[in-house]
Amino acid sequence: MIHAGNAITVQMLSDGIAEFRFDLQGESVNKFNRATIEDFQAAIEAVKNHPEVKGLIVTSAKSTFIVGADITEFGQNFAQGEKAIVEWALPVHDIFNSFEDLDIPKVAAINGMALGGGFEMCLVCDYRVMSDQAQVGLPEIKLGIFPGFGGTVRLSRLIGIDNAVEWIAMAAPKKPAAALKDGAVDAVVSADKLQEAAIDLVKQALAGRVDWKAKRQEKLNPVKLNPLEQMMAFNTAKGAVLAKANPAQYPAPKLMLDSLQAGASLGRDEALKVETEGFAKAAITPQAEALIGLFLNDQIIKKTSKKHEKGAHPVNQAAVLGAGIMGGGIAYQAASKGTPIIMKDIGNPQLALGMQEANGLLTKQVERKKLTPAKMGETLARIRPTLSYDEFKEVDIVIEAVTENPKIKEAVLADTEAKVRDNTIIASNTSTISITRLAKALKRPENFVGMHFFNPVHMMPLVEVIRGEQTSEEAVATTVVLAQKMGKTPIVVNDCPGFLVNRVLFPYFGAFDLLLKDGADFQQIDKVMEKFGWPMGPAYLMDVVGIDTGVHGAEVMAEGFPDRMKPDYKGSIQTMYEAKRLGQKNDVGFYKYELDKKGKKAKTVDSTAYEVIAPVVTSEKREFDAQEIIDRMMLALCNETVRCLEDNIVATPAEADMAMIMGIGFPPFRGGPCRYIDQTGVAEYVALCNKYAHLGKAYEAPQLLRDMAENNKKFYG
């Protein structure tokens, strides 16, 4: 044994070839943390001290190769400032360089996921052989940073500027065929032939059949383009990347491009210094803090959800009641992830609509070559449309998705309970009606739970799992595990009107309505909030949701929270509803809708909308300062999020923030309401609440925030 460390072992195989094996002890995956980097340095020194080593294959003992840097650990460095990040990163480059510079050929044998720093490790090797089951990539842009272990420098020299920019900016893992085509790997083989192929490539290098030194030299030299070619390549890349990523919202892509361009004409060592400086600039941005926070929050939620597996009972057969767009979407989602599902309704036209929804979604998958026609057939076969309860004795969980009307739901739920086994879980897809209230119609309320999908089901990642007063932990656990199996992110919340997401969303709509009353222009509000980072402004969002749906939800919320959600005036949303302007569903709302060339509804300005709401605008119309619009909209939303934490509706800031991002499109680069309050400064945020408190209770700072401000506390750290 040449080296035996906690993260790496090095041992001779044969013919002067040694195996440099990553196997981080006590972890299920390999990752670059401080311990791994220290061991990496020690292992390199050990190889240097063993002249009998003539070549290396780099392998992993795990099912993945290396999944990247330990962001939990390294993220702590980012709070230390730009200079400290550079001082931390440059010695890491020295270690990677010393491995690259070993005067022997090295081949990475990529058996599984090689992401971020893991793929940067592969790039340090002279050759890369990849299993046909593996994936490689540089996902750091999703975290508000970019590759910082030499990825921008080495990849651009290996595969060219245009390809490297696409790999880094898109941040998506690459399958073997794509990696081979672009030249990021040198061979793709079956998993069982991987080590043999890597050893064979080292032997070819040692025998002089491949020029490994010339191959390495490409990575040490400047990019092979003259200044004019470089300028053209970067201008094209900037146009493509910055059209998708506004630097004011997502600065990392532009910082990456600037670093790449500045380092392209330099040799490796100087280019790495440029990369490090750019990386440090990205790492200290509030966007990086927010996006890294989201990644960590996602890990927390996955761990929380995993804990439910022990308490769940298996779901071998599901059912959905109500076969409209929602029911069809739920059936599609379950069936496409392998769970057989019965879809019941009271009439054939409704069943046809549900099957049409599932069929349409699957057809699109086939057209995009993401699914074969045979797999589509298998998926459709898992959906059994029916008008009867005959097969419901087989069902482990029933998801009710009928009209959002308490009396109808209560009747359907009671009827269903009589047709299923005593241990069958019944879940309601209600968006606002109290689970505790609906449970009163049932004999076994402990088996009843909320399972709130968001529309469209196939696109929206969040499922709220709602615990009523009598809901058992088994019912919660079973529903959480099913949601995960369906490819969704479940967040468990306690029961209240609107649950978590809608309870928070309606004060946001209330703030919008109040701004209109005070003379703001809804188009200006939409533009300001979209520039702030929302995918659409509140007027457009209300049209998409449906103004009738919004009015109904507002009534439920006003009944539940009259002190801050029951307006003492008639607003524009109610007025639109009374004028039968329902939004996209009937083509007129705040905007007018017409089909574009692709057959999608496109919004246009409709002057009639202003005439409709004019009677309820009590102040003279004026142009508002953008920051006032932002403050009034965001305070109402963030305050209600904090109240949900105070009331134990949601357990943690991490879950609250993720729910808002996945459920209503809160700008990811701002990290969620709790992160937004932290980055504003809790004391400063409370002062803003005080400034706008005259607008009503929705603007009053919750006691939790006042206590946090007094004690200099934050939600994170």
Curated annotation (Swiss-Prot):
Signal peptide: none annotated. Pfam families: 3HCDH (PF00725), 3HCDH_N (PF02737), ECH_1 (PF00378). The active site is at H452. One of its GO terms (biological process) is fatty acid beta-oxidation. Substrate binds at D298, N502. Pathway: Lipid metabolism; fatty acid beta-oxidation. It catalyses: a (3S)-3-hydroxyacyl-CoA + NAD(+) = a 3-oxoacyl-CoA + NADH + H(+); a (3S)-3-hydroxyacyl-CoA = a (2E)-enoyl-CoA + H2O; a 4-saturated-(3S)-3-hydroxyacyl-CoA = a (3E)-enoyl-CoA + H2O; (3S)-3-hydroxybutanoyl-CoA = (3R)-3-hydroxybutanoyl-CoA. Keywords: Fatty acid metabolism, Isomerase, Lipid degradation, Lipid metabolism, Lyase, Multifunctional enzyme, NAD, Oxidoreductase. Gene3D superfamilies: 1.10.1040.50, 2-enoyl-CoA Hydratase, Chain A, domain 1, NAD(P)-binding Rossmann-like Domain. Residues 313-717 are annotated as: 3-hydroxyacyl-CoA dehydrogenase. In the N-terminal section; belongs to the enoyl-CoA hydratase/isomerase family. This is Fatty acid oxidation complex subunit alpha. It comes from Acinetobacter baylyi (strain ATCC 33305 / BD413 / ADP1).
